[in-house]
Amino acid sequence: MSVQTRPDLKTVLISTGLVLTLAMGVRHGFGFWMQPISQAHGWTRETYSMAMALQNLMWGLFGPFAGMAVDRFGTARIVVFGALMYAAGLVWMAIVDNAALFVTGSGILIGLALSCTAFGAVSSIIGRTAPMEKRSWAFGISSAASSLGQFVMMPVEQRLISHTSWQTAFYVLAALQLLIMLPMALRLREPAAEHAHGEHQSIGNAIREAFSHKPFLCLMTGYFVCGFQVIFIGVHMPAYLKDKGILDPDVAVTALALIGLFNIFGSFYAGKLGGTIQKRYLLCTIYFSRAIVVGLFLLAPLSTWSVYLFAAGMGLLWLSTVPLTNGIIASIFGVKHLSMLSGFVFFSHQVGSFLGAWLGGYLYTRFGNYNAVWGIILLLSLFATLVNLPVSEKPVQRLQTA
């Protein structure tokens, strides 16, 4: 692992930002393949939903281990490995026509790839490179980069599917993973390990400390809700709109792109405000606002413009939880094991994602609509608002007495 005292923050943010832009941008567009793949192979929506659900679950399951690997071997090596797995997973999705192999193979490969290229993998180098007073802002920048990917890549993915074929679209995206991610990974240089401020701690002690700390468990619970909500909307929104009579695919593309566009601002300002306002209050505001936005969307007459307004509102709240959650973890436990601890919290997020993706398909297959899932989303928003209220950013005793 190449180490220097303090790498340039701008270089780190640009490099990790491009990695996140591509990793998250491609992943957010997987919903566009639901109907063409299901029709081509004669599958139900539940089959493709299970593949997406397993991807998210594996992403979360591998997350803590990817975090440990980052802390041990450095961000660059792990991102390179993740880029290779991402390309392999996309090719797998293009060539496999057996349902069981498609679900398990794509779930494991893409899930592993995302654990090595998304927030958990890059949070450590960002947290250790940015000065403490800029840390929340830096996390906001990285979260905004992932939203930029959603805004940029989703129209690209839809047009690749429309103007070539869904298989060719996978091949093109696999090539992009290698052409863009690999050079960016090689630009990442680790800051020297900082052992001041009570940061001498083994992995086992760090895990025990975190799981015995109530705010950490509250963050995990709230993040479960976040995962359930965003994945259900990202995976099932295109199909939901078609079911409701909005047949133009460009409406779904535009809506999901608007979510990405508005979350650039939402994530950036969430990170910026997190430096001056208690992050738990911002998290509570985000979750409660989601209930309001979803409720208004369901009550209003459905039209193209109501879809766009919903997308803009959800976009402001979409990944705004990420810089705040990572910032709280860094404030409480320090940055030595930040990638690993963020990975554990993110695992909870991905359990929610698994249920959001799979349950959407399961309940649709059983009842022919998504009404029950929208109701669950409303209730979970209120639950997450209450769960985040007691979360304190006060450092653990180990850091206070150092």
Question: For the regions a protein language model found, what residue spans apply to each?
Answer:
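Hydrophobic core of transmembrane alpha-helices in multi-pass small-molecule transporters
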Residues: 21, 101-117, 224, 306-320
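Extracytoplasmic gate region of multi-pass secondary transporters
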Residues: 30-34, 214-268
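Conserved MFS/SLC helix-loop-helix module at the cytosolic interface between two early adjacent transmembrane helices
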Residues: 61-100
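Helix-to-loop junctions at the C-terminal end of transmembrane segments
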Residues: 62-75, 266-278, 364-365
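Cytoplasmic helix-loop-helix junction between adjacent transmembrane helices
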Residues: 106-144, 334
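Helix-loop-helix hairpin linking two adjacent transmembrane segments in secondary transporters
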Residues: 142-190
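Flexible cytoplasmic inter-helical loops of multi-pass small-molecule transporters
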Residues: 186-205, 397-401
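C-terminal transmembrane helical hairpin of 12-TM major facilitator-type secondary transporters
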Residues: 257-262, 276-328
